[in-house]
Amino acid sequence: MSIAIPLGVTTPDTSYSDMAAGSDPESVEASPAVNEKSVYSTHNYGTTQRHGCRGLPYATIIPRSDLNGLPSPVEERCGDSPNSEGETVPTWCPCGLSQDGFLLNCDKCRGMSRGKVIRLHRRKQDNISGGDSSATESWDEELSPSTVLYTATQHTPTSITLTVRRTKPKKRKKSPEKGRAAPKTKKIKNSPSEAQNLDENTTEGWENRIRLWTDQYEEAFTNQYSADVQNALEQHLHSNKEFVGKPAILDTINKTELACNNTVIGSQMQLQLGRVTRVQKHRKILRAARDLALDTLIIEYRGKVMLRQQFEVNGHFFKKPYPFVLFYSKFNGVEMCVDARTFGNDARFIRRSCTPNAEVRHMIADGMIHLCIYAVSAITKDAEVTIAFDYEYSNCNYKVDCACHKGNRNCPIQKRNPNAAELPLPPPPSFPTIGAETRRRKARRKELELEQQNEVPEENPDPQPQEVPEKVTVSNEHEEVDNPEEKPEEEEKEEATDDQENSAHSRRTREDRKVEAIMHAFESLEKRKKRRDQPVEQSSSDIEITTSSSEIVVGEETKTAAPESEVSSPVSNVAIPSTPQSTGVNTRRSSHAGDVAAEKPIPKPPPAKPSRPRPKSRISRYRTSSAQRLKRQKQAIAQQAELSQAALEEGGSNNSVTPPEAGNTDSSGENRQLTGSDPTVISVTGSHVNRAASKYPKTKKYLVTEWLNDKAEKQECPVECPLRITTDPTVLATTLNMLPGLIHSPLICTTPKHYIRFGSPFMPERRRRPLLPDGTFSSCKKRWIKQALEEGMTQTSSVPQETRTQHLYQSNETSNSSSICKDNADLLSPLKKWKSRYLMEQNITKLLQPLSPVTPPPPSSGSKSPQLTTPGQTHPGEEECRNGYSLMFSPITSLTTASRSNTPLQFELCHRKDLDLTKVGFPDSSTHSCADRPSLLNCNHPDLASHPSVVPTSEAGFPSRSGDGPQTLLRNSDQAFRTEFNLMYAYSPLNAMPRADGLYRGSPLVGDRKPLHLDGGYCSPAEGFSSRYEHGFMKDLSRGSMSPGGERTCEGVPSAPQNPPQRKKVSLLEYRKRKQEAKENSGGGNDSSQSKSKSSGAGQGSSNSVSDTGAHGVQGSSAGTPSSPHKKFSPSHSSASHLEAVSPSDSRGTSSSHCRPQENISSRWMVPTSVERLREGGSIPKVLRSSVRVAQKGEPSPTWESNITEKESDPADGEGPEPLSSALSKGATVYSPSRYSYQLLQCDSPRTESQSLLQQSSSPFRGHPTQSPGYSYRTTALRPGNPPSHGSSESSLSSTSYPSPAHPVSTDSLAPFTGTPGYYSSQPHSGNSTGSNLPRRSCSSSAASPTPQGPSDSPTSDSVSQSSTGTLSSTSFPQNSRSSLPSDLRTISLPNAGQSAAYQASRVSAVSNSQHYPHRGSGGVHQYRLQPLQGSGVKTQTGLS
């Protein structure tokens, strides 16, 4: 056969090995393409693969060519990559796929691609018309050009060009062939055969493909055998022993002649027996290189040997002249073929002839079959080698090329060919149901019938029934619609006839019309039956009809009566099929709803209108989803029609006797329901037309409106349901992501939506159920957002923020309903709405505060007494106790909870002075009553600690109550918190790591939260909880700190330990974003360390808290609390925050830190993935180390505190830093009370401290480096045996754990102090955290050793902690100190004087704290005070960060 060859390819010699790395383009594409396609299934790679891997060994390629008819990208690749032949791009070049999945090309590849693209453009321009015809076969059309591009791009550098090529031709094909292809396109989509028809019909396209195949193929030195062929061969060999002997002979042949052929495989035939000659521009033939005697082995036909059915998987072959496929059926009657389109040798150019001079014979060598071309007659040199047709050319729809002499008039092929061109058209008819032509013919037949029927009635003109004719017309139209085959042309014709008929109808008598209508009804029924038999056709026609009918409906809308009648008509649907024509679109659907029952007379619409819309609809049908919409709408309408049907049937049954005359073929009937005066006719028509009618009466707009209304109603339903509070972090994150109010604030970093999408992997039960268990968790839609925002502004006060927060954070398991009930009004509205409302309030008041669950809600700068938070918590704690939640869930507690839960909602509440005073009393009481729990006081009442400075009396009074109340609350909330936090934090991406570190460091995590709360100025139940945990739990946490789950326990969710893996994986973009943020933060020294902490994923924050916990978390729960990223929530941190809030600098720092936390919250909120941690672990720890070093350089040991202080104060002021340093030492001191009690525990279990520290380090907030330090910290804690000497033990632990991995950790340790003010403070404190932790430890040591509670004590504590810190940091934190100190130093340099002042102030605070909390010990007070100062500084840093 003549082979079309793309220009520019001189010889097939070019080894296609150059192409893709694979020897065989197909193999390359088949495997990589297939694999990648599966990988990139989203890009519809699967579509190509789908065809490609149909069990064919060469799945991708063979199917492609089969499917594409054209060489398909594979072939194109093969060819095109080779096309670049001269360029010979390494098949596997450095080019690779970027993470985006886009192919990155090397310069060579790029050049090649460009060249290829240009060449392809030129080629394809020639080929456009038909070249892709087969290429457009099912899969091509299935894949969008973009998809194709992806496929190629993904696979090989060359593939890109090929892809581009294919894509463009595809588009071109569509555009040029649209006219004729459009109808066929339907066919193509519906059936590959029709797609084939399209391609087959276009010889040009085929030629183009052949050209590609001609030049673009891979040289086959050996055959590729499909598994089926191999199996057949094995069976054959076993069954036929005779062949066993032949293999030797065949082997000889194979090794000699065949081998020789192989060696010569190049531009000319092997052994020079044959050579490829370019006969025409695009055709090559195989000529004898010399005179060949009879039975001479000319060449082996090599390629992909497969069973014929495999090759013809799609049955496309005979639609296209696949020139490079050899069919062979003489082997055991097994029909096999050799596909050499993309992988073959020169034998592929052998053409078929009616007078062949060679034949194909098979030889079996090595157990494999070889198809060889033998001369069947003497072949002279340069004579073309031809073989007989190995396929039934008479079945081909395309012009078959015969190699015989063109002058041969006897050539049967040539004789057949003239018809061949026509054949393509006939084949579509062969698929009458599918063929567009078939539809047209049917439509024409119907038209003819209708016309005839109409003519009959016209003979009996009756002027009166014009309305009735209209009805008839409607039914006719329905029929037309029913006929999917009816074409716009036919419609136009019908319209013309309709116009005539309309006039005629008026002349017809009622009886005639009735008769016609009845006839039409029967006809339509029959047609419907036929259609049902042809479901495929029906589906396509339905789409068309639906579109057209909808348009018609629009036309009818002008006539409201018609639509109504149509709606009613569904009843009579069954009766009258005649309506189907008009309802054709509705036919199948119309069956659901009666079509037009023209109860009301409607003026005939101009027939032209209906016809016009129909064509449009048909056109749009393929391009738009309007058809689908219409289907949906019609379905809805059908239902409605069914409802109305009953009524219509009642009325229509009376008139059901005669449908409007079917004869009325007014295609312009325009769905007019027969509104003839004759009720019977109307009813009959209605019943028959009902399907179409019900749909027609409603325009698209109407339908859409109804649909939207229904949809809206459905949406409203979930609102009625009580909100289900989910602690699942994924759900919360999703909710937060959806919150309109939060969306605006960068403060809220919710879990990446892709996390949410998959649900929390650690909650299989939750995973099973939709992440959004309630309608309340609906997707955030603009409309909802707008409503929420608008309503939120007006309705924000509708429900107490506390209550709302509770609902948000209450676990589904806990008393959701109770709290939800409270918010029923809000809950009635979509969750987003009330959330947005609440957030609006929050945004108005505290949107700047960090909203991430990890970050505490920043206390308002204005809120001067952390008590506000604490009191709020106290009441909430009570409420929580009632609700089964710990304080965390109380409205005020929800402040803390909010912080934990990523809800900034409670910030204001936290800062409410009145609440603080009252509620602080409660938490304070519990705290004080727990004298054994200095940690509780510290942890739970860092606020109180700060409060003493603010409201000494209330704080003094509250401590005892605080101890009692918090204990009770803690107990009550303990369970709640465990549940809530286990769920929330164990599963929250933020807490996943903290839980891992601090499962049993849950206290530290709580402490961390508490420090967050400190910033927030609240003692959350979590704080109390953490304090309890710190006492009772810290040991557990310490023990469990080693366990990843421990961190979750720290979260206040001891049960979360098994979920440490819950660190959510972050998308690459997110990861980069975080990393960049970390870098930016690191750029600011303290801020950088802070942001790093955030980047590390609050992980460092956690580590900071961990360090704190380790340093003083061991001492007390407060220390433990600070360890978690929630340090702010931790009591000690809370107290620090409260102190900060109390002191102007503190409050200022707090506000700043809140601002920063907001900035940082995004990073904190997102827990870095383990990979991210590993990636960032290097950079973040390095940055932290560098900052520490800088700080150390400024002040090796004392500088630690001063650096820390500076660092913390830097973010805020010179004052801030001083308070920070003093706060650090104070924090150490303050924490030492907490720590002290905890240290006592730790003394009991030094391991506990280390574990808690580890947990802290493990905390996701800390970041993985922190985690590893945390573990080392634990190890250190255990090793030093310093737990007894809490300060030293913690210091040593911090030092040990932080030495290298812990740089961030030590920084984090400082951060706990500095971090106390805010989650982010911990980051800024990262550098400081080392010193801070050390001072804390020192302070804790001093705390452990009775230290004056007076101001002098604070200074002493500070000095002790400083000295201790200095020692520890220099000893164990050298790196950390360096990393932390550098930032600290940077910070310090600015506010040294300020630091001194702040430090003094912090000491003063500490003194006041000690005064207020004498039982704690001045060290403890100092720590608190210092921490608050620190907090202010930290807050500042936090704010900066």
From Swiss-Prot:
Residues 539-552, 561-572, 635-650, 1087-1107, 1250-1259, 1284-1300, 1335-1372 have a biased composition (Low complexity). It catalyses: L-lysyl(9)-[histone H3] + S-adenosyl-L-methionine = N(6)-methyl-L-lysyl(9)-[histone H3] + S-adenosyl-L-homocysteine + H(+); L-lysyl(36)-[histone H3] + 3 S-adenosyl-L-methionine = N(6),N(6),N(6)-trimethyl-L-lysyl(36)-[histone H3] + 3 S-adenosyl-L-homocysteine + 3 H(+). Transmembrane segments: none annotated. The modification Phosphothreonine is found at T855. GO terms for cellular component: chromatin; euchromatin; nucleoplasm; nucleus. The keyword Methyltransferase applies. This is Histone-lysine N-methyltransferase SETD5. It comes from Mus musculus. The lineage of its organism: Eukaryota, Metazoa, Chordata, Craniata, Vertebrata.
